[in-house]
Design a protein with these regions (language model features):
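Cleavable N-terminal export/targeting peptides
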Residues: 1-131
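Intrinsically disordered, low-complexity segments enriched in small/polar residues
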Residues: 6, 12, 26, 41, ...
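Small/flexible residues
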Residues: 6-7, 34, 55, 65, ...
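Outer-membrane beta-barrel transmembrane strands
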Residues: 24, 85, 89-90, 95-158, ...
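Solvent-exposed loop segments that connect transmembrane elements
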Residues: 161-183, 236-258, 310-333, 374-404, ...
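A short acidic (Asp/Glu
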Residues: 372-374, 443
């Protein structure tokens, strides 16, 4: 009987070990499998799983179990497996367990971002900690077109045309400052009006997850033109003011004066703006409803200005060697071009709320602005009985400042863009935006005009004395653009 009990205990121990090979190990309230060595499992070809239990039952407890619940010895102890008695193995179902972890969803490229679930449990993740491809809106290629309604900083114009009441002494006619002189054109800014324009954007993602890409853009504003024209048959006073460098006093050139001259004066200021660039796009963080991208690349920007002043005069009476009927054509031209080339770095962010979205873009470009300044002038004299003659120089453009000038300076160009829109379809959206752009060290045509004139340089220039004025005195200023835009974007 004693031998039978011992065999029963051995059989029970073997069965328990065999069942435990498929059960976790119990530590308090946690079970875990532990590899047993081959030495601990005689007759086994490879290590098996054994059971280790904290607070395991004692030999006495095992004997009590064997005494109360004897088990006949099977023919092959090692081949039969029976479940362990409930008194030995605890109820696994009663132990605490870790909640199952939801697997990361697999998303095929091109799946609409709004339909992608996130690990946070919603359609839109609250933070940028999880990036489930593809990030952002669908489509690997995008292109957009925007109508621009922007205004640029106008160029400053000095007083170009003045008038005085009839009867004003010839030496004071059109002279500034004078209580009887009014400015007809100039003395303020020109080309600061809102103008229409167009901007084209496009890009492509280089990977299926929309994390790396290339984008490019180009824009232009329609040319701004500010024109002025006046004329008189000699019944009114029209003048062009300047500062006499010989006398050190304000002075004026007559365009029309009763009994002396009849003439016309036209002045035109023009301005144009174009720009563009190419950027690499590197995603910093994203979730199905928002993304933040790093931008770095190349930026180009051009601002061009021109001022053209023309006079057509006819002498009404002879003055010295000038017979009556002599005609004059006087031209002054000032032109500037600014070509900025630089490297740009910035951020682009977008957040989506269902079918609506908002975005912001900020960047700064550092580089070189090449300033090109051209000053030209000519005077043509056509006597009534004689050959026409042409002279270099007009009034404000004289041999002392006429020329082609080139200079390169360091410049900074920050840019800010905001937009909000609606996702019309999965592949199309419309939006409205606001844009601001700044460029430092810009040469404007109006700033290159020097009102100091040495009258001895005026044609026919028989004897030149005194200072070489007007002079080339380059000036630079700040340039800004701001305005609104409406656009449509397509993705493929």
């Amino acid at each position: 009987m004693f031998v039978r009990k011992l065999l029963g205990v051995a059989a029970f121990a073997g069965l328990s070990a065999s069942a435990a090979a498929q059960s976790p190990v119990y530590y308090g309230t946690t079970w875990r499998p532990v590899q047993a060595s081959a030495a601990e499992q005689p007759g086994m070809m490879s290590p098996s799983i054994t059971i280790i239990r904290q607070n395991a039952p004692s030999v006495t407890e095992i004997r009590q179990v064997a005494a109360t619940e004897p088990s006949p010895l099977p023919a092959d102890i090692g081949s039969e497996q029976k479940p362990a008695p409930p008194s030995v193995l605890p109820d696994v179902s009663s132990t605490a367990s870790t909640p199952p972890v939801a697997p990361t969803p697999m998303v095929s490229p091109g799946t609409p971002a709004a339909s992608i679930p996130t690990l946070e449990g919603g359609t839109c993740a609250p933070t940028c900690s999880t990036c489930i491809p593809p990030c952002g809106p669908p489509g690997r290629v995008w292109v957009s077109a925007e109508w621009l309604f922007w205004a640029a900083t106008g160029q400053h114009l000095p007083p170009i045309a003045t008038t005085s009441p009839v009867g004003t002494d010839r030496s004071l006619a059109g002279v500034l400052p004078s209580p009887n002189t009014n400015v007809l054109y100039g003395g303020d800014r020109a080309n600061n009006d809102f103008r229409n324009g167009l901007r084209i954007n496009g890009g492509v993602w280089l990977d299926d997850n929309h994390l790396f890409g290339i984008e490019g853009n180009f824009f232009f504003l329609g040319g701004s033109k500010n024109a002025f024209a006046t004329s008189s048959n000699g019944s009114q006073i029209i003048s062009r003011p300047f500062f006499n460098a010989l006398t050190g006093l304000p002075d004026a050139e007559l365009v029309s004066y009763p009994g002396v001259l009849a003439g016309s004066l036209t002045a035109e200021s023009r301005s144009s703006v174009i720009g563009g660039g190419v950027n690499a796009v590197h995603n910093l963080c994203c979730n199905p409803c928002s993304r933040i991208d790093l931008l770095y690349g190349y930026r180009y920007f051009n601002v061009s200005d021109e001022i053209d002043i023309r006079e057509n005069l006819t002498a009404l009476s002879g003055q010295g060697l000038v017979p009556a009927g002599t005609q004059y054509q006087i031209v002054d031209k000032f032109k500037t071009q600014n070509n900025f080339n630089g490297g740009v770095i910035g951020l682009n962010a977008e957040e989506r709320f269902g079918m609506f979205f908002v975005g912001a873009r900020a960047s700064v470009a550092l580089g070189a602005n090449n300033e090109v300044i051209d000053i030209n002038g000519v005077t043509r004299v056509m006597p009534p009985n004689g050959p026409a003659m042409a002279y270099v120089g007009g009034l404000l453009a004289q041999p002392s400042n006429i020329g082609h000038y080139n200079n390169t300076v360091f410049a900074v160009m920050p840019e800010l863009g905001l937009r909000a829109g609606v996702q019309v379809t999965q592949w199309a959206r419309v939006f409205a935006g606001y844009n601001f752009l700044y460029l430092s060290n810009v040469a404007r045509a109006g700033d290159q005009i020097d009102l100091r004139v040495n009258p001895t340089q005026l044609p026919p220039r028989t004897l030149v004395t005194g200072p070489n004025l007007p002079a080339f005195t380059p000036h630079t200023t700040d340039f800004t653009i701001n305005g609104f835009s409406l656009g449509v974007e397509l993705r493929f």
